[in-house]
């Protein structure tokens, strides 16, 4: 089992719109059978305006299939695209972390 973390450092004043996008994405992920996504904002940390979204996958192959949209309908693909439309305008930079869950 793997833990995937999407870490986004938003532009000032753009955290809430990005949180809304991740919360909508979480609902779509559940609807698609991908599981629940946890969405967190920084209380204090390395940088201000940070959002972390994390979820679990069985394997890298499962993650790759999820990222390629395998198993979802064209209608759901459009919903995912609509939710994430314009997110580049909200983010300065980001990164992905992948951890193996040991226990």
State what each model feature region is.
Residues 3-8:
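Active-site-flanking beta-strand signature of metal-NTP-handling nucleotidyl enzymes
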Residues 2, 47-49:
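Residue-level preference for beta-strand/loop junctions
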Residues 20-38, 56-95:
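An amphipathic, aromatic/His-enriched active-site/gating alpha helix that lines ligand/cofactor pockets
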Residues 1-2, 103:
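Absolute protein N-terminus
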Residues 94-102:
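Long, low-complexity, Ser/Thr/Gly/Pro-rich intrinsically disordered segments that act as flexible linkers
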Residues 41-47, 87:
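A short beta-turn/loop motif at secondary-structure boundaries
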Residues 9-20:
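Short, surface-exposed ligand-recognition loops at beta-strand->loop->(often short) alpha-helix junctions
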Residues 9, 54-56:
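Short hydrophobic/aromatic beta-strand micro-patches
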């Amino acid at each position: 089992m793997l833990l995937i973390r999407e870490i986004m450092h938003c532009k000032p004043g753009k955290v809430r719109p990005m949180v809304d996008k991740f919360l909508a994405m979480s609902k779509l992920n559940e609807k698609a059978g991908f599981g629940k996504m946890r969405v967190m904002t920084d209380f204090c940390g390395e940088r201000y305006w940070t959002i972390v979204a994390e979820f679990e996958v069985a394997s890298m192959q499962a993650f790759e299939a999820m990222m390629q949209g395998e198993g979802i309908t064209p209608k759901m693909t459009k919903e995912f695209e609509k939710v994430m439309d314009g997110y580049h305008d909200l983010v300065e930079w980001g990164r992905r972390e992948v951890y193996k869950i040991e226990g």
